[in-house]
Each structure stands twice: as structure tokens, then as C-alpha cells.
Regions:
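A compositional/biophysical signature of low hydrophobicity enriched in polar/charged and small residues
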Residues: 2-180
Length: 180
């Protein structure tokens, strides 16, 4: 009996930690990535402007069920924004480059702030390995690229690779099948 008491005491003592670790996943709710949610996410990635009625037809649920699922996916952070995908070359930003940056640890916040402030920085990743940061940059000219690189060079050692062409970009995310 003492062991059973310890088991339940420890479970309920750490239950808030378990809940925090798994976010909004509840032990009693449906799987957050069931077949309908995967279909819904796929449809929204193909066209985020679809109405709830169009989504309902595509996913095979009612409009209220779709609205509720979208609300839950937004609240849980699965859907965190709706964004247009821009053809950068058509608006005068034909050059895509990748910047690798190696810098001391104390420069982390300064680099993150700079990356957030520069409109030419499309993505910034803190990475493992020899480099500390990997950034995707979109610019109108090599002169603009050079100015961006110089801003980061003040924080550490840089290396730049220019993309000749982009073969795969903005590929839809496919949620894993977690149903048993």
C-alpha cells in the first residue's frame, strides 16, 4: 500500500510538469494530429484563404467542427499565422544567399536582435557544429548582400554562399501520423 501511495503521490506531484511538457495535449482529448487535423493543415497550407465551408467539404466535417478545430489549432500554436508566399525575384529581390556565422556565445542576443531588425534576413537559425548561426538572406544586389554581411561580420567570422537556383522552397509541413 505504501508503494501505491508513493506512486500516486509522485504522479500528482509531477502532473503539472507533465502537462507543461506536453503543452495542450490532454490525456482525455482526441489526438491533436488525427486524420482530420492533418487534412485540415494540408488544405490550409495549399490555400490559407479557403472558407470554413470549403474546408469542411475538403476535410469531410461540418463548418462548426472545422471552425472549432481551427480555433484549437491556433490556440495550441500549431497554426501560428497566415502568410502570403511572395515571389521575391518578381519584386526586385532576385538574390538568395546563405550566411554562416561563427561567434562567441556572448554575441547571441546581439546577433538575434540584428537578424530580427534587418528586413533582408528571411530566416535565422541558431545551429550546432562549427557555425553558430545560419541565415537565409534575400537582396536586390551583390552590393546589398555585402552590406548585410558586413553588419554580421562585426559579431564574428562569416561565410557566404549564393544560391544559383532554388529547387524546393516553402514545402508544406506534413504532421506525423500519431494515431494508434
Amino acid at each position: 500500500i505504501y508503494l501505491i501511495y508513493l506512486y500516486f503521490f509522485n504522479f500528482y506531484m509531477y502532473f503539472p510538469v507533465i502537462q507543461k511538457s506536453f503543452g495542450n495535449i490532454s490525456l482525455n482529448s482526441e489526438s491533436p494530429m488525427d486524420t482530420h487535423n492533418r487534412a485540415l493543415i494540408g488544405a490550409l497550407q495549399r490555400d490559407a484563404r479557403l472558407s470554413f465551408s470549403a474546408l469542411a467539404r475538403e476535410v469531410g466535417l461540418s463548418q462548426p467542427a472545422i471552425a472549432e478545430r481551427v480555433r484549437r489549432l491556433e490556440e495550441s500554436g500549431v497554426l501560428n499565422r497566415y502568410q502570403a508566399v511572395i515571389a521575391r525575384e518578381r519584386i526586385g529581390l532576385p538574390i538568395t544567399a546563405f550566411l554562416r556565422l561563427t561567434c562567441p556565445g556572448e554575441k547571441y542576443r546581439a546577433v538575434a536582435a540584428l537578424a530580427a531588425d534587418l528586413p533582408d534576413v528571411l530566416e535565422c537559425h541558431h545551429v550546432t557544429g562549427d557555425d553558430c548561426f545560419f541565415l537565409k538572406i534575400g537582396v536586390d544586389s551583390l552590393g546589398s548582400l555585402e552590406r548585410v554581411v558586413e553588419r554580421f561580420r562585426a559579431h564574428g567570422q562569416t561565410a557566404v554562399t549564393i544560391a544559383l537556383s532554388t529547387l524546393v522552397e516553402n514545402k508544406p509541413v506534413v504532421a506525423p501520423n500519431t494515431e494508434l
